[in-house]
Amino acid sequence: AIVLYLNQYPYQPRERDYAYAGSFYAFAIWIGFGVLYLWDLLQKKMDSRNAAIIVTAVCLFAVPVNMAAQNWDDHDRDGRYATIAHAKNYLSSCAPNAILFTYGDNDTFPLWYAQEVEGFRRDVRIVNLSLLAGDWYIDQMKRKAYESDGVPISFTKDQYHAGVRDFVTIEERVQQPFSMKEVMEFVASDRPETKSNRYQGGAVDFIPTRNLYIPVDKEKVLVNGTVQPEDSALIVDRVEIQLKGNSLTKSQLMVLDILATNNWERPIYFGVGMGQDSYMGFDKYFQLEGAAYRVVPIKTENNAAYYDFGRINTEILYDNLMNKFVWGNIKDPKVNIDHFHDN
């Protein structure tokens, strides 16, 4: 009944046992009957008080021992450090002083642990897209942290605080592409002509075109290593994207602003485990270098295959895989590797 009522869609991010807590009552009732049966059996041979004490002691001991005996072998995590290894591999995929966009908790919290507790690659600034809609989080991103400079965001506090530009509509008033930097300045402005009055509830910030671009300084991207010299002929004049949907969230707006304001100064990466919608059209300019995609001014048309984005820099990828990545003892035969880690 619970399964039918909740009707959860397939491929949940984790086993949601807590959703079925009500069904556990049935097992608890039968366990209670079992305890009562043992007490009834013993109290025929001794007084009820002693029978109750013995049954309670036996059950309190037998249940956890039985659980351990049945589950220890496939729950043993001794010597398994695959999670922290995976987090370090994410960070190792990034060039120095990089900005790394992540999305959920599973691809963010282990990275925070690696940086905060183990002091690993503190030059990389992790930007969690799920939190980027919060003004308090944007404040944090703009500040320097450890060895990482603040994230380049052009919006001021009064332009992104709670309740301001929580969403921005997309109105295709012009077809021609505009510089992403110019569009961000347009959205940040409080001039009356930058507001739309098409909606109930007052004026709303809007973007007047779907077609945006970031100009490319070819000399700069070659000098700072964004593009390798052997790929210089592939550099495009500008990175172009087309916005989808009818509006942008504050988080999406900040992503565009970061990419525009950065102006190819710092390396920018997106995590490999994110949904395609989070890439906002930049996936045509991705370069796989490990566990993250780097945004580069080289256009690669995506294949139809799922999660087949951009190009691969085989030299950097090979160096990361063979010389920088760690694997958390997964090759040790004594370490329990379950099917999640096999995948």
Regions inferred by a protein language model and the residue ranges of each:
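ER/secretory pathway lumenal C-terminal domains and tails of membrane proteins involved
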Residues: A1-A21, A26-N97, A114-N343
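Phosphate- and divalent-cation-binding pockets in alpha/beta enzyme and binding domains
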Residues: F109-Y113
